[in-house]
Each structure stands twice: as C-alpha cells, then as structure tokens.
UniProtKB/Swiss-Prot annotation:
UniProt-annotated binding residues for GTP: 228-233, 247-253, 272-275
Co-factor: note: Binds 1 potassium ion per subunit.
HAMAP family named in the record: GTPase_MnmE
Subunit description: Homodimer. Heterotetramer of two MnmE and two MnmG subunits.
Any one cellular-component term (Gene Ontology): cytosol
Record-given protein name: tRNA modification GTPase MnmE
Location in the cell: Cytoplasm
Alphabetized GO MF terms: GTP binding; GTPase activity; metal ion binding
Chief location bin: cytoplasm
CDD domains, per the entry: trmE, TrmE_N
The entry's keywords: Cytoplasm, GTP-binding, Hydrolase, Magnesium, Metal-binding, Nucleotide-binding, Potassium, tRNA processing
C-alpha cells in the first residue's frame, strides 16, 4: 500500500543498467536540505542545472553530478523536488540513494511520485494513466493517443460533460426544494436534449475505443483454417524465423502460438491456431476450441485455404464462421504455385505460396491498420471505458424519469456525475488509488 505520509521519498527514475546518465529523484518538504548534505554547496537555484561533487556522509567522494532543484509548487509532485543526474550504471546511483536513506529519506514505492502529484492537484487520473501508458507504449499510434490524453484532451472532455450534468442537477434539485413550482416545459426539453446528446457522446467514445483498442494495446490477428493448409508456414514467414513446427501431417499445431511483430508503425500480436475440422482427436478438439476463441478476441482474421485442393464442407464452414464474426477478414489462398482447384468465391483474396507472399499480407495489413483513425478522442483504459458505460446507463435511466420522479431523476444524474468524474478525479476509496498507482514504475 502506498504511504500517505508527506515524508521525503527518493528513487532511481531511469532504468537500471549501463548508460551515460542515471537520474535519482527526491521529493518532499525537506528534499533540498537532504540533497545539500551530500554536497559542499549551501544552496541550489531553482530550475538551474548545477554541476557539483557528491559525497557520502563520511565525506568520501562518490561522483560528480548535475543537480536540479524544482521549488514547490512548481514541480512534478507539487513538493520540493531535487534530481541528481549522475554517471550511468546502477552502482554509483545506489550508493547515493543509500546515503539519502541514512538521512531519513524513504525509498519511494512504485507510482508514489505520481500519486503525490495527483493528491497535490498537479495531475488528474486521466493524465496519470496517460503517463504510464506512454511509458509502456509500443507503437507510434499508441504514443500519439496517450500524448493527447496527457495534454489534457480527455480531461477537458470529461470536465465539460460533468459541468453540464452538475448544472442539470442544480435545476432539478431547486425544483424539488420548491415542489409547488413545476419545471417549465422548455427547460425540460432543454435538459432532455442535453442528456440525449451526452449519452450519445458517451456511447460513441466507448464504441470507438473498443473498436480501435488495438491502436493502444496492439492489434490481434488470428490465423485460422483447416489442418495442413499452411498456417504455421505463413506464421514463420511473417515473423521471418521458424516459430512453429511445420509438417505434412495434419493437426501438427495443437497449442495456440502467439508472437508480437511490427507492421509499419503498428504493434501486431499474431495468433496461430489449431486447424478446424470435424474428425479431430480429443486433444485436437481442445485446440479447435482455442481457435474459435481466437477468432472471437481477434481484431483481424487471416482465413487460410489450400488453393490446390477443391473446396469442401469444412472450407464452407470456416468461410461462414469468419464472415459472421464481425471482424476484418483477409482470405488467403495458399499454395498458389500449384494447380488451382479451389472453387469458392473469396474475392478479394490474397494468393500466395507459403514461402512467397508474406510481403503482400504485411502490405494489406499495413494499409488496413493505417486506415484506422487515431486522431479521434479515445479512452485508453478499461477503467475509463467502464466509467463512461456506467455514466451512459445512468443518464438513460434518468431520461425515463424526467418530468415525473424528480428525486429518482436526481439520484441517477448524481450516479452519472460520479461515474464520469472518476475518470479524472479522486475515488472515495483510497485502496483503489493504491491499486492504480502501484502499477507505475519506480521514480514515477
């Protein structure tokens, strides 16, 4: 559990390992005094890089480093913050950190700097989530979306909607207090229009965020088809190394195989699945269930068929399955270097042989992924999506009560305000904050 104390905390803010620079971050009401005790200087000017020698409490020289002082409240945490920019590697940095601990500075817990920034109104929850997401982002699209959220785009969106709901609640509660006076019809219509618009906005942002979740987490691509149509060969070709066992024996792939690779600027997680067929053994049937589950969770499906064989009932079943999945489907006609016998119309399709044609698949994937607009407002976490869904449901319940049950209407609007506010503002339960910030890295 993250401490709620206002004591001085410190952590190494850069990744452990060999590098040219290592940064130690120190925050708290006496951070400056603690930092100066490891030097022979008497003060630091705010926001000015100062080159100085660092000593242990026993006056042993440790390093020559740059120190920067951020005076409260003009710092990341809102407290006094001092940074030591030491030479890289973790040995020297750990030695300096140990000296700070001897002075009574506490080692920070993961996310504690960001939690202090939040508690000191330097950061809201949406921006905090964006910072952590940006640190962990693995594609340009994700970085751009999260940078906009960190800039405050989502926070402004939430605050505008919250203010409209609060204004509505004020009108209604005034009417409840003066029960003899009914709300004017034109005001009821204005409230109805505003609530319908906000519910529609919430539904839209949830839909966009769920549909384009792959822009942040990476797109899942499932390779499906009958046994022995070349799914594993295609996987190996896309990855440019032998990840899956290839055999002429049908049903070689029984376990689900997952690997990440880049398609242009996008992260893709590709899933090779067991072949789908009727007469499968017990273990293979389990693999087939995994295949069906992979289609369900995938953003994109590569449906692979053997173009050198006539189509059969199993092929028709797979075509129907993927077409009804609601996912983006690319039909791959493999073994196109052999005589063409496949007689199902799968236009448009990609004709390849397992060892040739991966570039065309990658090109089609890249074109499709590039077409996914990342400029629209998006929610970056499951928490944000849930809060928007809850707010939308509460608003719709309120609409059904408008003009009749005003006390219940006010309750539902309060519920909607609480749900939407939780995207940027404090939760009532401190343990939820602890859970969120505990996933941050040290020094953040």
């Amino acid at each position: 559990m993250i401490s709620s104390k206002n004591d001085d905390i410190a952590a190494i803010a850069t990744a452990h390992g060999i590098g040219s620079i290592c940064i130690i971050r120190l925050s708290g009401s006496t951070a400056l005094q603690s930092a100066l005790k490891l030097t022979k200087i008497s003060n630091l000017s705010p926001r000015l890089a100062t080159l100085t020698k660092i000593y242990s409490l026993d006056k042993e020289f440790l390093d020559e480093a740059i120190m920067i002082y951020f005076k409260a409240p003009a710092s990341f945490t809102g407290e006094d913050v001092v940074e030591f920019h030491t030479h890289g590697g973790f040995v020297v940095a750990d030695m300096i950190l140990n000296e700070l601990v001897k002075l009574g500075v506490r080692l920070a817990e993961p996310g504690e700097f960001s939690k202090r920034a939040f508690l000191n109104d330097k950061l809201d929850l949406a921006k905090a989530e964006a910072i952590q997401g940006l640190i962990n982002s693995r594609s340009e699209a994700a970085a751009k979306i999260l940078a906009r959220q960190m800039r405050g785009d989502l926070s402004r969106y939430v605050e505008q909607m919250r203010n409209e709901l609060v204004k509505t609640l004020a009108f209604v509660e005034t009417s409840i207090d003066y029960a003899d006076d009914d709300l004017p019809d034109d005001l009821l219509e204005q409230i109805k229009t505003m609530l319908e618009a906000n519910a529609a906005k919430l539904d839209k942002i949830v839909q966009i965020s769920e549909q384009r979740r792959g822009l942040i987490d990476g797109f899942k691509v499932a390779i499906v088809g009958k046994p022995n149509v070349g799914k594993s060969s295609i996987l190996n070709s896309l990855l440019s190394y032998e990840r899956a066992i290839i055999s002429d024996e049908a049903g070689t792939t029984r376990d689900r195989i997952e690997e990440n690779f880049k398609v242009g600027t996008h992260l893709v997680r590709i899933i090779d699945t067991a072949g789908i067929r009727k007469n499968a053994g017990k273990i293979e049937k389990i693999g087939i269930r995994y295949s069906l589950a992979a289609i369900e969770e995938a953003d994109i499906v590569l449906a692979v068929f053997d173009s050198s064989s006539a189509s059969d009932e199993q092929d028709e079943r797979i075509v129907e399955l993927v077409k009804n999945s609601g996912k983006k489907v690319f039909f791959i006609l493999n073994k196109s270097d052999l005589a063409f016998k496949f007689d199902l119309d799968l236009s448009p399709s990609i004709k390849i042989s397992a060892k040739k044609g991966a570039d065309e698949i990658v090109g089609r994937l890249r074109d499709y992924l590039d077409s996914q607009d990342s400029s629209e407002m998006m929610l970056s976490s499951n928490h944000q999506i849930k809060q928007c869904k809850d707010a939308s449901v509460a608003i719709k319940r309120a609409l059904n009560l408008l003009g009749d049950e005003l006390e219940l209407f006010a309750y539902e609007i309060n519920t909607a305000i609480a749900a939407i506010s939780a995207i940027t503002r404090s939760f009532e339960r401190s343990e939820i904050l602890d859970e969120m910030f505990s996933h941050f890295c040290l020094g953040k």
